[in-house]
Amino acid sequence: MRMFAATLLGAALMFVSSSPARADGDAIAGKAAFEAQCSVCHTAVAGKNGFGPSLAGVVGRKSGTLAGYSYSQAMANAGLTWDAKNLDEFIASSANKVPGTAMQVAVADPEARANVIAYLGTLGTAPAVPAADTSTAAQAPLEPSTQGPSADELLHAGTDTQGWLYASKDYTGQRYVDLAQITPANAGQLRAQCIYRSNNAGATQTSPLVYQGTMYLTIDKAIVAIDATTCRERWTYNWDAKGAVLSATNRGVALAQGRVLRGTADGYLIAVDMAKGNLLWSRKIADAKDSQYLSMPPLVVGDLVIYGPAGADWGAKNWIGAFKLASGEPVWRFNLVPDANEPGADSWTNPSARDHGGGSLWTPLALDAAKGVLYVPVGNPAPDFYREVRPGSNLYTDSVVALEVKTGKLLWYKQFRANDMHDWDLSQVSPLINATIAGKSRELLTVSGKDGLLRMMDRATQDVLYEIPITTRTNVDAEPSIDGQHICPGLLGGMEWNGPAYSPAAKTLYVGTVDWCGTFTKTAEPPAYAQNAHYYGGAVTPDPRAQARGWLYAIDPATGKQRWRQPWPTPLVAGITASKGGVLFTGDLDNNFLAIDANTGRTLYRFNTGGSVGGGVLSYAIKGKQYVAATSGVVSGFFGGTGTSAVVVFALP
């Protein structure tokens, strides 16, 4: 954990060489040294990890094996037994003993090392975390061992200060917490309380959820449950893929009635017991042979799980559907690229183009629960850059689709990019906001996407009240060409997988965006669809990553006028959380967790998490204390990043 300045016996004591430790160490002196220096990261309490693993029972333990703690890959593979000799050599030079370890320690004084080792030998053993059932062979759906969150709790998740029950907080997607313990006056005093770090070096875009003191998140193929205040692991469920995988990126779980739900990379929707971590049911709903995979966070309303696949860039023909919470049995389906006999099919002038027409789901949904209206953000058509293959407007790609949530009936749609040629997905349909405009009460829908525009719609009339740029936009009408066209935003611009936040207290919308251009090319000949291969019809070469930037905006949702704007040295793709205390919480690709003054945009606090922050950032209160959690790690192949998948939890002292 390289971000922490103090580690075992103090990383500041760096020497070239050392002598073997004495055999007759003083445990009392070692305890004093441990409490003065080592305890910054480690505890001596069995079952309680700090930034580093608990050292209770470390003598005689295999390296990298303590249940409940996620080690660096180097430590997990070290294959050591922590006897006195190995401990002495590690403390003398961790880098020499375990090359690549995140621990940085080098203590030359053999007496000091012997004292600490003597003290470690007096400590007890740590309890093992119960192993979760990882079987995927559940025959009939099982009942969960616990209950909650209930349908009513999900309905009122926006006012729940103790939990975070949907990827974007609640059905409205406002990403706002009614907590004011952390303010601009004291945010600089925030301190990291704990870290959960896995060995996964893949994409970390998950949005953790919190319910009754437990945090639930996805890491690669796993669902992990940890204590939301100590980061201690409670259980892990690992899904073993049964088929081909196009992409392993996953953006989180849903919680409902004792179940944790997620989609898997090989096309299964699964439910796991919230308390025990065992599989309750699994259902195959998508398939890589159809160019589909599952990445979005599910949404649960009543007894329905709302979900759908991604895969447009591989030539999928996508849909959104509802499944029974108790079993995964399908209830309804709406085709986001219509079949021949469905409304919208005539928007594909070449009927065969619909077979691989795209329309991915990869970001959160929004729901007007009072009216029963589901808002769906639909992604780009395929092939991405060769639109001559698919003449027409290509419904319902790059559209907001409004459905009756109980039946999947189409209520209305609004397409924002007809016959898209830039892979500019419509990515966000939240937050939902109620505002007074020109003396009239309006129910608003915030719409944004990779084209770098933010629109405000009236949900009742479907009128677009305004449209404003939120990143650099140049040459936007240019078509990809064989020689290339430089266009802003590029493939990775505008609004990505985390949407804006809205503070009803400040009546302000907060928006983090990506400012990154690229050169768009198309192939000389029309592309041919091939199973399990990208169906682009061209390519985008992003400008050098060093040129990629971001923006953080505060916007009046009633008018679209900026209250303030801050340029950022990296793209901003992490979640943003607004709070009653007047502090925004987010992160950036320079590994920083950030607390920002919501009134001015001034940075109040930053902390290097050891990995790029590109997933969820959330806040909640447990036993009267406000916490903030941020995910970190590698963001994606395009955005890059460092570190393994982790969650860092912060609070005031």
Regions found by a protein language model. Name each.
Residues 12-22:
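C-terminal segment of classical bacterial N-terminal signal peptides
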Residues 24-48, 55-59:
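Sequence/structural segment immediately N-terminal to covalent heme-attachment motifs in c-type
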Residues 138-198, 232-241, 278-287, 329-337, ...:
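Aromatic (tryptophan-biased) beta-strands that constitute blades/sheets of beta-rich domains
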Residues 164-168, 202-221, 245-268, 293-317, ...:
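Repeat-blade elements of multi-bladed beta-propeller folds
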Residues 180-285, 579:
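N-terminal cofactor/phosphate-binding cores enriched in small/glycine residues
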Residues 272, 276-277, 318-330, 393-409, ...:
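Beta-propeller blade signature
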Residues 81-133, 274:
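C-terminal capping alpha-helices of c-type cytochrome domains
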Residues 42-48, 60-61, 92, 121, ...:
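Detector for the c-type heme attachment site
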